[in-house]
Structures are given as structure tokens and as C-alpha cells.
Amino acid sequence: MSTVPCGVLRSRIRYDPWTVRSIAALVALALLQAPLALPPTRDQLFALFGSYLDSLRVQAGIPGLAAAVIDGDGIVWEQAFGQQDVARSLATRTDTPFHLDGLTQVVTASLVLRCVEDGRLTLDTPIGSFNPGSADAQATVGQILTHTSGTASDPVFSYRPDRFDALASVVSTCTGSSFRLAVARTLERLAMTDSMPGPDAANDSSLAGDAGRFRNIIDRMAIPYSVDAQGRAAPSRYPAATLTPSAGLVSTVLDFAKFDLALRKGNLLSADTVAAAWRPPVSSNGRPLPHGMGWFVQTYEGEPVVWQFGSGAGASSSLVMTLPARGITLVMLANSDGLAKPATLASGDITASPFARLFFQVLIK
């Protein structure tokens, strides 16, 4: 596979955390200078955020990135950066489809929790009740959702997205359909017309009526790239070849905003269920663990932050952050793995992400 000099990255610059920190410092300086004049308007803050986000994208080795901010009424800001196809110089758009990778888990969690709400299963039900041959047969549904093991009084956290795949049989048993079809129905219900339940969905006979739309989504999907230390982008392949509970969902930032709104407005789950999903289990020493049911949960300067990330090695990445108290969400999708590194985020600290820190610094402070 040939390596294409990635013009969208502007220069062959190694991803450098010191450079990333300098961007954050410039943001802080810009905001410190703001009180000397009139306080910045919301549009000015979004313009500043977009400018620094684009600079950070370049430093992180991301050819193309789409982002949106959603409040309780809908999308308040959206912007796309760079190129979704470097060889053809195709600019990224906010309706460009990307692989969601690990963000698929939040959709899976919503399906499972809806089954719990409807009384079709409990969080204490063992996975073996649905799939006796599962490697996680002794684990409960709740343990899979929270990435924990051990006992209820002493849970142990270990982030392993592949464990989520055991939930396919749970959803299938609850809904009476395949896992893919259950996801497809959710996408249809939310009018997520630029999304598809797996990159191979067009080949599923149970979804034959949508095959043409799915092929159109594939044709418009961002090309995945592996970017080297010199900023050169080589076309690669998305790791997920099909839909599983942990990966494979294809969507856009505009479509994901519909899911976010439906979740926060109670159209998918009750407010009590969402609150429970966003409440982390507590270890035996009284400390909260970093992952709720489908979402990471932590606090930033005393404020709750709910988030999840996805990473397709050498191909794609995604990040979503919600601040429940403010009713605001940021979602970002990228066609390289520069947006979300598992080595830094899997432990459950969103502040390890320079993109999250930029969001906090510009739009939340």
C-alpha cells in the first residue's frame, strides 16, 4: 500500500505533546486577554474553539475530522476539518460517515437498558442464561455494561470492549430479532438516515429494503488512514468488518446528535435509567470506578462528565463527551486513530485527551 503525502496535515510534523500543550497555553492566553475588551460572544468562542481544534487535528495526525456541539434543543455548532479523502482532495463534511468504533457501545447499552426497563431481564442476569458457551457466562449483564468483574460488594474495573460482544445474545433474546436488526430499528426510529448497522449491512437480506441507502453511505464514507510520525497518511482499512455490540456502527456527527438528544430527552430511556447508567459502581474502599453502564463517568473540577471513545487502530477514532449539568455534548469523528488513544483513555480519565482539555478550556471555563 502506497504512502500518500498528507497535504491536509500541512507539514510532516511529529505528534508532539509539548506542541499540544503549547496550543492549550495559547488558548488560555487568548481567554485571559478577553476581559480587556468585551466578553466573547458564543459565536466568537466557537470560532476560537474551531481554530484551535483544527491546529490540534494537524498535530495529532488526523487527515479529516467532523465535530458538533449539541445542547438541549439541538446542534448549536458544527464544523468539518481537513479531508475525508486525501488522494482525491475531498473535504470532510459534517454529514461525512465515519466508523464509530467503541461509540457503538453506547447504542448497545441503550438497547440492553431498554430491555431492563421493560422487565424482560435484570442487570443481575448471568450472560450464560442467554449464551451458555460464552467466555463470560458467569458474568452478569450489569458487569458487562460496566466493564467490571468480581463481586457486587467489591467490583474490579478493566476496560475490555470485546466483552460487550456477549450482549448480542442478550439483545437478540430480548427483542426477538438479530442484534443488527435491533440496532437498525433504533436508527430508523431516530431518523438517522446517514447511519448504518455495520459496514456490511447492505448484504443482509433482512435489511434488503435499505441496501441502496447503505451503499450510498459506504460511497460517502471517510477513507481510513494510518499516519506516520512524519505526518504522511497511508490509506488503510477499518478494523471492524461487521457490526458487533462493541464496534462497527457507521454514522455522522449530525446523526449521532439525534441519538444524543433522544437519550437526554428521555425518548430512548427514562430519566431514572439514564441517571443509573451514568452512575459508576463503587469499589469496596468507597471509591467510584471509572465506568457506568456503557459510558465512562468522572468529574472535572467538581462537575460530572460522561463520555466514551472509539479507536480503530491505524484507521479511525471517535470521542463523545456530555456534561449533564450543563446539558451540552461534544461529538467528534476522525479518519485516523489520532483522536483517541486507548493507552491514554482506557483507564478512565478524559483529561488525558488534549481534545477534551481544549473543549473544557474554551467552551466550559
List each language-model region with its residue ranges.
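Short active-site loop at a secondary-structure junction
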Residues: 58-66, 87-143, 152-162, 244-247, ...
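Catalytic loop of the DD-peptidase/beta-lactamase superfamily, centered on the K-T-G motif
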Residues: 36-79, 177, 234-365
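N-terminal leader/targeting segments and the immediately adjacent pre-domain N-terminus
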Residues: 1-92, 101, 114-121, 146, ...
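Short, surface-exposed loop or secondary-structure junction motifs
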Residues: 81, 85, 126, 134-314
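Glycine-rich, flexible loop segments associated with nucleotide phosphate handling
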Residues: 92-97, 214-220, 347-358
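Hydrophobic (often cysteine-bearing) scaffold residues that line and stabilize catalytic clefts
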Residues: 45, 49, 100-104, 108, ...
